[in-house]
Amino acid sequence: MDPQARKNQPSLLRLICRARKTIRGSADDIGWLQHAPGMPPVEDGTKRFMELLESIRNGEHKLPNSMIYLLVPGLFSNHGPLYFVKTKMFFSKMGLACHVAKIHSEASVEKNAREIKECVEEIYWGSRKHVLLLGHSKGGVDAAAALSMYWSDLKDKVAGLVLVQSPYGGSPIASDILREGQLGDYVNLRKLMEILIRKVIKGDIQALEDLTYERRKDFLRKYQLPKELPVVSFHTEASIRPEVLATLSHVAHAELPIIPSLSARQPRKVPVVMPLSAAMAACAQLLQVRYGEKTDGLVTRRDAEVPGSVVVRPDRKLDHAWMVYSSLNDDPGEADASQVCEALLTLLIEVGQRQRHEISMKDG
């Protein structure tokens, strides 16, 4: 072999490796939990959820005041006080004790898990009531981590967990943005996603680091949710209709790179007023085109299903930021975030009651 060719061989191999990594992206990781050995199957609870939601919209409320309800916010907690506050007020008007966990979305999963554990203990010791947790987005991952890591301390204090649009298995957006060694046009695609997500979460892009497939696989190898814990998973997909992408509002802003003209050397940046819904729709469309996966703009439906959980798969188009902006523009013809949370927690209580009955039948 020519010496120069031999010298260039490692560089060529690295280039091939980078090209393969770029092209495949997250294709081999999406839905990995569904094929992982030893994972328990899920159960479809969509029909029962819809029945409970309809009853709630007709004024029938079943959540007991013998529990404390802890809401755990996720990546959009930086959008201010509207996030989960309306749901807390909604619960309070029904005479229910409801708290919102004070965690920072940009903190690591392990750090937030510790803080959630301490929050649950404080609530329990102050009330002597069991706690039901509902986490949205990364908040669901953080809450699940708390119960996985500290179950021996929390098993007599926690009655169940709901994960709403949570990337329990990981997120292709997180993995694709943070993956190194990408080439060509995919770098521009990555940059577009990064611009959208950075503006949407209003924080450090490293907040996504613990949500990459690599990080989630590492974590779940060490910690898994206890089998006796009642768990409900809820996931949706975003609407990517043209009118959603075209909608403008004041909620979030993005600077989108404009393709330079022939006479211009540098691409111009134009500030574009972009609502959360449009940013999520844009991300959902990118993921649909690249991977053929239905997502809420951040999380694929398959990655949001926790093994062994009762899964709710509504047909209604809801993106990942819906919990935030539903407080701003509720459609009276549809259930709002507070009602959805109530229905999910009611379903969780039913799941827990059924599990306890099954255990007692076995013991009997």
Regions found by a protein language model. Name each.
Residues 83, 170-177, 242-247:
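Short aromatic-enriched loop/helix-cap "lid" or pocket-rim segments at secondary-structure transitions
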Residues 113-221, 296:
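Serine-dependent carboxylesterase/thioesterase catalytic core
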Residues 67, 127-131, 229:
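Short coil/turn segments at beta-strand junctions that form active-site/ligand-binding loops
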Residues 72-75, 137, 166, 236:
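Glycine-rich His-Gly loop
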